[in-house]
UniProtKB/Swiss-Prot annotation:
The keyword Ubl conjugation is annotated on this UniProt entry: yes
InterPro entries: AMPK_C (IPR032270), AMPKA2_C (IPR039148), KA1/Ssp2_C (IPR028375), Kinase-like_dom_sf (IPR011009), PRKAA1/2_AID (IPR049020), PRKAA2 (IPR028783), Prot_kinase_dom (IPR000719), Protein_kinase_ATP_BS (IPR017441)
Cofactors required: Mg(2+)
UniProt induction comment: By AMP.
Source organism: Rattus norvegicus
Listed name of the protein: 5'-AMP-activated protein kinase catalytic subunit alpha-2
Active-site feature positions: D139 (proton acceptor)
Modified residues (Phosphoserine): S377, S491
EC number: 2.7.11.1, 2.7.11.31
SUPFAM superfamilies in the cross-refs: KA1-like, Protein kinase-like (PK-like)
Residue numbers carrying Phosphothreonine: T172, T258
GO CC list: apical plasma membrane; axon; cytoplasm; cytoplasmic stress granule; dendrite; neuronal cell body; nucleoplasm; nucleotide-activated protein kinase complex
SUBUNIT field: AMPK is a heterotrimer of an alpha catalytic subunit (PRKAA1 or PRKAA2), a beta (PRKAB1 or PRKAB2) and a gamma non-catalytic subunits (PRKAG1, PRKAG2 or PRKAG3). Interacts with FNIP1 and FNIP2. Associates with internalized INSR complexes on Golgi/endosomal membranes; PRKAA2/AMPK2 together with ATIC and HACD3/PTPLAD1 is proposed to be part of a signaling network regulating INSR autophosphorylation and endocytosis. Interacts with DUSP29. Interacts with ARF6. The phosphorylated form at Thr-172 mediated by CamKK2 interacts with ACSS2.
Lineage per the UniProt record: Eukaryota, Metazoa, Chordata, Craniata, Vertebrata
Domain of life of the source: Eukaryota
Length: 552
């Protein structure tokens, strides 16, 4: 359990220093946070334990949040981490800079039909994703739809919604009255998904009209309007949109549109990106994915047999089964999203810029990685050799490239934080070339010679990074820019997924405790020139010790 600390007069929780308040919700504040090591900005939602206890959800909230951390959808705010203190939960979430859809509509008025449809398609895709994984929002509103820098929608605040079970009715009345369905404000029983559909209808109306379909300062009058389901449809809305709105804002939940109905509506289907509702015909629910099972074991600290028992039980609400299907679905939707943007010329500033295609400063694509976007999409999927017309064609199967290093799908700043922790543990000395490139040395206690190597983090593909190990010989001088071309690479052990946390006392001092004051080239670092064979063995021993430390 973490403790709150003070950092330069500001509150620090874990590695995050809290800053200004972004908003205030039912259960507490949302503040901007900055990672102390990387400077990465996050949104930190502070949930007061006492307020949560009053709702009688403390017992299940941790388990629910564990699954919410697995949610990966391009239009849902990501939950990275949950930090607990005796008084609060701190939910560390993705930060987007565009603000709320509510503020955007207030400032600019109604949105053009094409843009409104694009945003609504993104919102419905996110809601469908959550419903398929047994989670309902129950408080959808423009204030909970955030916009990124490229005007893409991202839904926030799925954190406190109940896990939805078949046949289970939700009695809790929550949400804002203007967006709440008639059955919610009337205190009647409701199952869950249908109240989100109503709220989506209100959001669509707000996008197209710049106002709310049901609004009144007098709450009893507002409730009467909602129960009656009568709202004004402006003349500029075409008949197709009007029929969709009336179907979504149907008072009787049994007659209300479902997500399937909306997806089949002619207006909704126009210009619908394929990645929003991916279908993978190769996916067979009867085949168990071993990699997904292992990931569930890692996330929940359970055994493979426990996961298999959950899958064979046939209970779709089982937490391990939900997590397994989340992982499968995440892989499918991200693969299709990537293919969609590779197969067509992407719009300027697409969400892929924020997702897979964004390369932080100092982080380079791997030299042997195909460029992510090439003008002609069919060629973009060709092997590298097919693009090299000077290289003779071979009928033999091309061997996979091997690298001495570690591949990971963790965030680049998390990978580097783990590297700093391991190097400090091993008493390595290092110099920072840039945020993702280090020059490292270790003294051989027997010979007294220094062994040197370069650590460079590369972007390998849309989801993977390679921490490349390169030997630095006394005769090799790297460029001042810090760029290093990988030498002929050796085999890597396997996939390593760094832990999400780093010891704070270690991480806070990494930039000072291990840094070198001098250059890592020339005779400054070595009192004697090592023999080539000895240097190579020392280099491999250095690599092995670092890999072992990272695996702990």
């Amino acid at each position: 359990m973490a403790e709150k600390q003070k950092h330069d007069g500001r509150v620090k929780i874990g590695h995050y220093v809290l800053g200004d308040t972004l908003g205030v919700g039912t259960f507490g504040k949302v503040k901007i946070g900055e990672h102390q090591l990387t400077g990465h900005k996050v949104a930190v939602k502070i949930l007061n334990r006492q307020k949560i206890r009053s709702l009688d959800v403390v017992g299940k909230i941790k388990r629910e949040i564990q699954n919410l951390k697995l949610f990966r959808h391009p239009h849902i705010i990501k939950l990275y981490q949950v930090i607990s203190t005796p008084t609060d939960f701190f939910m560390v979430m993705e930060y987007v800079s565009g603000g709320e859809l509510f503020d955007y509509i207030c400032k600019h008025g109604r949105v053009e039909e094409v843009e409104a449809r694009r945003l609504f398609q993104q919102i419905l895709s996110a809601v469908d994703y959550c419903h398929r994984h047994m989670v309902v929002h129950r408080d959808l509103k423009p204030e909970n739809v955030l916009l990124d820098a490229q005007m893409n929608a991202k839904i926030a605040d799925f954190g406190l919604s109940n896990m939805m079970s078949d046949g289970e009715f939700l009695r809790t009345s929550c949400g804002s009255p203007n967006y709440a369905a008639p059955e919610v404000i009337s205190g009647r029983l409701y199952a869950g998904p249908e109240v989100d559909i109503w709220s989506c209808g209100v959001i669509l109306y707000a996008l197209l009209c710049g106002t709310l379909p049901f609004d009144d300062e007098h709450v009893p009058t507002l409730f009467k309007k909602i129960r009656g389901g009568v709202f004004y449809i402006p003349e500029y809305l075409n008949r197709s949109i009007a029929t969709l709105l009336m179907h979504m804002l149907q008072v009787d939940p049994l007659k209300r549109a479902t997500i399937k109905d909306i997806r089949e509506h002619e207006w909704f289907k126009q210009d619908l990106p394929s990645y929003l509702f991916p279908e993978d015909p190769s996916y067979d629910a009867n085949v168990i994915d071993d990699e997904a099972v292992k990931e569930v074991c890692e996330k929940f600290e359970c055994t493979e047999s426990e996961v298999m028992n959950s899958l064979y039980s046939g209970d779709p609400q089982d937490q391990l089964a939900v997590a397994y299907h989340l992982i499968i679905d995440n892989r499918r939707i991200m693969n299709q999203a990537s293919e969609f943007y590779l197969a067509s010329s992407p719009p300027t500033g697409s969400f892929m810029d924020d997702m897979a295609m964004h390369i932080p400063p100092g982080l380079k694509p791997h030299p042997e990685r195909m460029p992510p976007l090439i003008a002609d999409s069919p060629k973009a999927r060709c092997p590298l050799d097919a693009l090299n017309t000077t290289k003779p064609k071979s009928l033999a199967v091309k061997k996979a490239k091997w690298h001495l290093g570690i591949r990971s799908q963790s965030k680049p700043y998390d990978i580097m934080a783990e590297v700093y922790r391991a190097m400090k543990q091993l008493d390595f000395e290092w110099k920072v070339v840039n945020a993702y490139h280090l020059r490292v040395r270790r003294k051989n206690p027997v010979t007294g010679n220094y062994v040197k190597m370069s650590l460079q983090l590369y972007l390998v593909d849309n989801r993977s990074y390679l921490l490349d190990f390169k030997s630095i010989d006394d005769e090799v001088v790297e460029q001042r820019s810090g760029s290093s071309t990988p030498q002929r690479s050796c085999s890597a052990a396997g996939l390593h997924r760094p832990r999400s946390s780093v010891d704070s006392s270690t991480a806070e001092n990494h930039s000072l405790s291990g840094s070198l004051t001098g250059s890592l080239t020339g005779s400054t670092l070595s009192s004697a020139s090592p023999r080539l064979g000895s240097h190579t063995m020392d280099f491999f021993e250095m690599c092995a010790s670092l890999i072992t430390a990272l695996a702990r």
